[in-house]
Amino acid sequence: MRIFSFLFLLLLGILTGQGLVSGTDNGKTTDVTWDKYSLSVKGQRLFVFSGEFHYQRLPVPELWLDVFQKLRANGFNAISVYFFWSFHSASEGEFDFENGAHDIQRLFDYAKEAGLYVIARAGPYCNAETSAGGFALWAANGQMGNERTSDEAYYEKWRPWILEVGKIIAKNQITNGGPVILNQHENELVETTYDPNHTLVVYMKQIAQVFEEAGIVVPSSHNEKGMRGVSWSTDYHNVGGAVNIYGLDSYPGGLSCTNPNSGFNLVRTYHQWFQNYSFTQPSYLPEFEGGWFQPWGGSFYDTCATELSPEFPDVYYKNNIGSRVTLHSIYMTYGGTNWGHSAAPVVYTSYDYAAPLRETREIRDKLKQTKLIGLFTRVSKDLLKTYMEGNGTGYTSDSSIYTWSLRNPDTNAGFYVLAHSTSSTRDVTTFTLNVTTSAGAISIPDIELNGRQSKIIVTDYNFGTNSTLLFSSAEVLTYANLDVNVLVFYLNVGQKGTFVFKDEPKLAFQTYGNSNLTTSESSYGTQYSYTQGKGVTAVKFSNGVLAYFLDKESAWNFFAPPTTSSPQVAPNEHILVQGPYLVRGASVNHGTVEITGDNANTTSIEVYTGNSQVKKIKWNGKTIETRKTAYGSLIGTAPGAEDVKIQLPSLDSWKAQDTLPEIQPDYDDSKWTVCNKTTSVNAIAPLSLPVLYSGDYGYHAGTKVYRGRFDGRNVTGANVTVQNGAAAGWAAWVNGQYAGGSAGSPNLAATSAVLTFNSSSLKDQDNVLTVVTDYTGHDQNSVRPKGTQNPRGILGATLIGGGNFTSWRIQGNAGGEKNIDPVRGPMNEGGLYGERMGWHLPGYKVPKSASKSSPLDGVSGAEGRFYTTTFKLKLDKDLDVPIGLQLGAPEGTKAVVQVFMNGYQFGHYLPHTGPQSLFPFPPGVINNRGENTLAISMWALTDAGAKLDKVELVAYGKYRSGFDFNQDWGYLQPGWKDRSQYA
């Protein structure tokens, strides 16, 4: 026994020395463990630097890899993913995980290929500004009873979903060679009562049980909805339902798109919160502000300068590191598009979110700044085990500076996170920082914070064998252990940096660049000081260390592409590249370093591989002219796209057809669904009978068309109330004549109007009231009175002047819950006649009876038109050119406009509400090389008519790319088939 114990301890010591650690596990797997410091995967501590990504909001699976490569290149090692029940289940008992973007196996495969772990978040409720919070729309009509509780009716609905999606998640766990390391239970569910029999506790236990049935063994997690409660932590009132890893969501910015001086107030109480409520677990922020959503009538994301500023990640994300957070997920990192009718009413078509990666997949400065943090955390292993040594304003010579002081108890490495105490200030402050090192107390001079700037100052920072920084006032971006140890610093131009190598004599060095290095002696070693010049400076030291000094702009274009596919990248498993817009990947083969990437403009490219046998650079498969520097790097030129002229076709050949024939009294609606219910499963009682809630008749997303009949000439009008979400308008006609309606309001989900009937238009019998309603989504759970169950459609309709309606019929999207277009899915289309007939689909042949009219002509009264055109693109094969459609309308226009590209509804334009008028299309929805079908539906909300004054294709940026955008997207664009049965 003693021999066994000795051998066990010896082995443990060896494993610990190799960086392998043990920790708490969940009793199901030891592949993912944790302690109060960090998560560990396969025995290796990991700083989880994750980005939120929603595959549903980018319906081209091949582009998921494009996004993942960009995240990996910019320092991320994980993605957090919602799986929306609504996207996969058009009707009860039916689940689609195969067609198009519904094939989530490809999501896991691409994540693994890109080198990213996955945090799975399947709900069943998600929120996420998506329609009904991600609940299947067929169930969001009251039939689930008390949602998000242990109600049996609810349980019976969500259980099949979690079982089905859970099996796929389970197949892709780290234990099975997949990328999934955490599985979230529910979403922001506040634990209101600590009682083992409480319905929420029972509900969370049910979720855990069903995930276990599905085969999930990785640790569970949950995300607290801000500091509003303490929920599901094993360290606080654990009466059941607790998860393994507690997390806290936080959106602290308080920023304004219209006032650049608002907000920017840091939260400095995260550490105390986690110490109080999850002290045996690592500090986890499952959702930390990567931007913020904008409502109908709000601002457009491109105008939100404060949200887009790189100052935000620099200050806020470093503050989180100072708070000892080691699981950090940014919501959103790529937002995407609320295409079709997938949005909740709180947002419009774009879900750009002012995220680091633009909706068009373009890299913002915000992402470039985020990369500096991601690459730092990737190599800074001592950061993964620290305690809070202290914090406050007493660490510097200036009390306006706030400091977090973290210490690794094993290595004595220190991390001092600095920011202005008043985080919103724009003051420039120079000060001295007092630090504790292995050489004693040291005062580091001439540290500057330029307004909304933060810095992480390291002490006793190891960056390779026999290589340690005693301290550095320049920030460390990353380091590499190659043939020599390579250290990369960054500062703003003009800022001063000072560093000391631990236990090193005065070193000789050679400088290459604009930043001049000087030395001075001290009791703790030679100090090396410099003022950051513009661009890149390399310094070769006599101890072999190579140091790069980068200004911020150069750091933004600095990459460390891994040479491993693992999300965990050791310092000897990446090379260093400076210059291009994006470096997707790199490898060394037969004396050549092969790099794939993207460039907007031609740039220099410098590569350090640490391999003296490497003589050439291949950029996107082509060898470029290369020279070798005195310090061992290779330099060449990476071509860009600045000389490429993008000529987009004008859209001047349109055909138009009536998309509201139902207005006419003689329209045949005999095959429509009869509205004859006198009771509803919905707990909200209708204002009149019969029930006219669209969900009760199997129509959920998109436009609805109602036709109600009544008799008599004495009726003077009708009182109608419609509820289809914020900003949703509606219009009504009696026997073909416009009778009124509502243009909708961003502040109202339901609107009422008293319709006025012209007596001359009425008949003794069989008058027809046609009501056409727009739709902006189902509410999320937090919206009163009943959240996702708040009904859609007509809440009430009564005649004025005597009598009742004799009948009602409804028509919605073609097929209702049948999901006749499984590739695009159940939320793409609504019930406009042109949609039901498939006029928006590729291959539809416009009849000769269609008029030659464009959206610029519009309609003169309360009418609707469906406009179609085709155009061809022939972009170069190696180009990524995001393309969108710019719309405009005369002031005062009140209309509902939809944009369809190759069958996908990728634009919902309300010119009277705004703010969005520019709608981008990703490749795969638009064909960059080939024919495209563009359709625009437009119906006027008043008898003043409606038209557009701008309809033109626009290009965003243009990039020479190593990614294959020249693919056959045909499988994503199923064509037209006869739909006459849905008239």
Curated annotation (Swiss-Prot):
List GO molecular-function terms, semicolon-separated: beta-galactosidase activity
Q: Which residues are the active-site ones?
A: E188, E287
Alphabetical GO CC annotations of the entry are: extracellular region; vacuole
The enzyme class is hydrolase
Leader peptide range in chain numbering? 1-23
Show the SMART domains listed in the entry: BetaGal_dom2 (SM01029)
Domain of life where this protein originates: Eukaryota
Protein name (database record): Probable beta-galactosidase C
Record the organism.
Answer: Aspergillus fumigatus (strain ATCC MYA-4609 / CBS 101355 / FGSC A1100 / Af293)
